[in-house]
Amino acid sequence: MASILRRGDSYSVRFKYKDHAGRICEGWESFKTKKEAQDRKISVEKELLDGTFLIPDAMTVAEMLYKWIPIQSSKHKWAPKTYTHTVAMIQNLVVPYLGKKQIQKVQTYDLEQFYATLSRTPRGLYKQGVKQTLTDKQKRQFLTGASIREVHAMLKTAFSYAVEWGLLLKSPIPREAPKSTSEERAIWDEKTMLAALQTMTDPTLHLAVHLSMILSLRVGEILGLQPGDINFDAADGRGTITVGRSLQRTEKAALEKTDPNQIYHIFPDQREGSSSALVLKKPKTKKSSRTLYLTKPLKEELLAWLEKLRQDELAMDGR
């Protein structure tokens, strides 16, 4: 039960509750009038009885996010790059502005103001949580709407966990995400593609660009291809190539925090003391694993490339 005490010109409601560790604590809330105190006495007794009382907690936004990220990463089996990117968002786009604020004091209005601040924030203002000195040109290059929407999506998920953990009764995240204007990427037409290929003299670069143009492969997917991924006899001799892995450079710290089953191989360091590693990993999503058809010119170039590799291996063995 709660009680009301008069303290000078104000009235205090005193009550007992159990914190997250099960310890019995005493709560005090002050009001200017006796009527306000009486109303709060009734409401807090009801909350304590039906389990809707919000246990006071001084956890900050930064503390909550750094508690949430390893749980989210493990639960959804994040790739190292996803982990690194999310940590960077927290360090550089959230903590400098909201990090010290207690989550129980965050209001929807605070977040709307936060998004407005981000829209006026130059890209790269913070790196690893440290404020950078920018040039005049860099100061005019602001965060994109897509970046702010990404921050919104992350906070929406993180604050939903805070509700599940009993730190909040409801999430303060605004219902509508910040607006984002998408910019269409300029894509080469067929004539430009052919002209580019015809001017390339480096065979490695030529094959990589040819694969990218015809099959729409990402750089990491091209670098992750192996001879066994190619079936020249499939599709009635047309030939296919199967995408099933990707080569990527990632921070070693992220590798320690993410699912090891996402990684096929970690390559040895080329430089001693490097903070990152080159890894061969599973594709970004299940849909990223796919089988694609070859064109005749691409098939011929792949055959020639593999034959050259075979000849090079024979030459090395003969030494």
Could you describe each region identified by the protein language model?
Residues 151-167, 184-187, 285-319:
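Extended amphipathic secondary-structure runs
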Residues 7, 192, 225-307, 318:
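Conserved tyrosine-mediated DNA breakage-rejoining catalytic core shared by Y-recombinases
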Residues 57-163, 177:
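Short, Lys/Arg-enriched alpha-helical recognition elements, typified by the DNA-recognition helix
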Residues 16-19, 113-136, 231-234, 244-257, ...:
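Short regulatory "switch" loops immediately downstream of catalytic or recognition motifs
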Residues 127-129, 133-145, 149-151, 164-227, ...:
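Basic, Lys/Arg- and aromatic-enriched nucleic-acid-binding interface segment
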Residues 123-127, 141, 198, 202-205, ...:
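Short, basic (Lys/Arg/His-rich) helix/loop patches that form interaction surfaces
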Residues 2-58, 285:
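Short, surface-exposed polybasic/aromatic micro-patch for ligand or macromolecular engagement
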Residues 66, 105-108, 120, 169, ...:
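Phosphate-coordinating loops and pocket residues in cytosolic domains that bind phosphorylated ligands
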